[in-house]
A protein has these predicted regions:
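Positively charged, low-complexity terminal tracts
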Residues: 1-118
Length: 118
């Protein structure tokens, strides 16, 4: 059975690496929230972050292409062209925190164990 190596968690979801035995499978990040799971590369996670930022900008009253308001919810685009998510403003903020927290931890670990090592 595969275990996980947690990257970041908030009240809305979790991000983690899958592990096989003691080895971390680091080429993809599992992101779970709202009964959904996404298996993103770091590039896709960064792209998702940019799409979230676009949606937040639109939510704040700016004109952003590709984001449509649906009642009191939003359509959040994902790196998967055929998949958009209908979310509330509260969910948008929670997803934003989850993705930003995950990217922060990934970048911090890269610095500590990668480029920042002497």
């Amino acid at each position: 059975m595969k275990d996980i190596e947690q990257i970041y968690r908030n009240n809305f979801g979790i991000s983690f690496y899958w592990k096989e035995g003691n080895e971390i499978i680091a080429d993809k990040i599992q992101l779970l929230f709202k009964q959904m799971g996404f298996y993103f590369s770091i590039q896709e996670l960064n792209e998702f972050h940019d799409l979230i930022e676009n949606c937040v900008t639109d939510h704040n009253g700016y004109d952003t292409s590709g984001v449509k308001r649906v009642f009191n919810k939003f359509l959040l685009k994902t790196p998967y062209v055929a998949l958009d998510l209908e979310i509330s403003p509260v969910e948008l903020n929670s997803i934003k925190d989850l993705v930003e927290g995950s990217l922060f931890r990934l970048n911090l670990n890269e610095y500590i164990y990668g480029s920042g090592m002497n």
